[in-house]
């Protein structure tokens, strides 16, 4: 079985092909970073229009990469949600149309389930076994999920306001960093010194597994404003020190909540996925945590941390093999709780 996967939930156009016997055999990705850079964030209408231009050429490129034709494809998977409604509609329309034209089944995939299962694309030694705790951390989501199998998910905690990735991006903007801000802030934080600034670790002084990062963003804004009053214009070192303090607070907050979830369940495996999972300090912090707990942390390869078609083709393969099908109606779900997914 070979499944073509299409990802268009936000500002990356991803197309990939997953083969039941060979694994991932094609992976094409186009990012819209340059398109949105002047605006300092994703402009939904521009994102949708760019997906229209790029999806078909990427499908052709993926088929060429795998040395296949349309006749070799057994099914199509596409991101059905959550995400930007216009962007989702582009991918779903193309996917449904191709499925009809090629006379193959199609299935709509949950974007965050794609991220959650992205580590399964790794080789057997680096692939987590069920059950595990998953930390899904991106620009739009911060969730702790108890995972007992494919589709067997329990959201144990999530952000009640800003996602961690969103807080990274907004703090980067306050520091005057280039878009995409989260990655720029992480690079700058590596040059910062510990101890000059100390940020709070929100909601760690109370029980529970929910997150809140809006207050941390406000604390960053106040810290930056005070530093400007003291220095006039912020030096690069001051910016780096603030970035380091902010990132440390986020990483330690995430680690504390992960530790609570692991202790509550007794699990020894932790998966970290989503765009922020590429953050070096976060990876190291969670690796240290799992060493202390005598467990293991798993994460996707760097190219599968951000949005991509590979994770969609893989999850689509699992669900199509199970017999799931999406009818011809072109329907997307900008908001889609994971608990609504069918267990397989």
UniProtKB/Swiss-Prot annotation:
GO biological process: tRNA threonylcarbamoyladenosine modification
EC numbers on record: 2.3.1.234
Record's keyword annotation contains Iron: yes
Catalytic activity: L-threonylcarbamoyladenylate + adenosine(37) in tRNA = N(6)-L-threonylcarbamoyladenosine(37) in tRNA + AMP + H(+)
Predominant subcellular localization, coarse grouping: cytoplasm
Function summary: Required for the formation of a threonylcarbamoyl group on adenosine at position 37 (t(6)A37) in tRNAs that read codons beginning with adenine. Is involved in the transfer of the threonylcarbamoyl moiety of threonylcarbamoyl-AMP (TC-AMP) to the N6 group of A37, together with TsaE and TsaB. TsaD likely plays a direct catalytic role in this reaction.
Protein name, entry field: tRNA N6-adenosine threonylcarbamoyltransferase
Source organism of this protein record: Mannheimia succiniciproducens (strain KCTC 0769BP / MBEL55E)
Underlying gene: tsaD
